[in-house]
Amino acid sequence: MEGGGGSGNKTTGGLAGFFGAGGAGYSHADLAGVPLTGMNPLSPYLNVDPRYLVQDTDEFILPTGANKTRGRFELAFFTIGGCCMTGAAFGAMNGLRLGLKETQNMAWSKPRNVQILNMVTRQGALWANTLGSLALLYSAFGVIIEKTRGAEDDLNTVAAGTMTGMLYKCTGGLRGIARGGLTGLTLTSLYALYNNWEHMKGSLLQQSL
């Protein structure tokens, strides 16, 4: 009988442990001695302070050897596509303006609409091709300079812009090359200055203090 009772108790305890009711747990007295870090209690299952698990910045899973920031090659697709779309939009607006100006003495009719539409299409394609070509040259020079120097900084931006202007205006002789290079140098220098304006202002403020 006693053996049967003991067997029954073991069976009951095994079932209770299986459903999580009979296992040993942590009481309030056991958890009362666990120190707090801020407002988060330390887990009894971890030997690591949760403060070290908090990341101040977003972290992404990257392939081995990959950079956290996009390089020139990745940005080239966005740059070329954005310039083409911007050129098409600007050219379409300019074509609409020119079309309305050239046909202002004509009555609203099908020939006038066709002429305006042709002007919009022609100007849109022209500006999209122009800005897209400039973006392609700029991106290609940027990738080549980055791979050659092994670094990505504002010097690459200025050099790529200068070389783009020089190559784009190379058909105009030495004067055209100089003018294109100066234009590219000026635009990219202003862009680099705009990107680093906050950093420069903070550095000047620290020096003044």
From Swiss-Prot:
Q: What does this protein do?
A: Essential component of the TIM23 complex, a complex that mediates the translocation of transit peptide-containing proteins across the mitochondrial inner membrane. Has a role in the activation of stress-induced mitophagy by protecting PINK1 from OMA1-mediated degradation and facilitating its accumulation at the outer mitochondrial membrane in response to depolarization.
State which residue ranges cross the membrane: 73-93, 125-145, 181-197
Example GO CC term: the record gives:
mitochondrial inner membrane
Protein name, please? Mitochondrial import inner membrane translocase subunit Tim23
Asked whether the keyword Repeat is assigned, the reply is: no
Localization in the cell: Mitochondrion inner membrane
Topology relative to the membrane = Multi-pass membrane protein
* Keyword presence, S-adenosyl-L-methionine: no
Q: Name one GO molecular function term.
A: protein transmembrane transporter activity
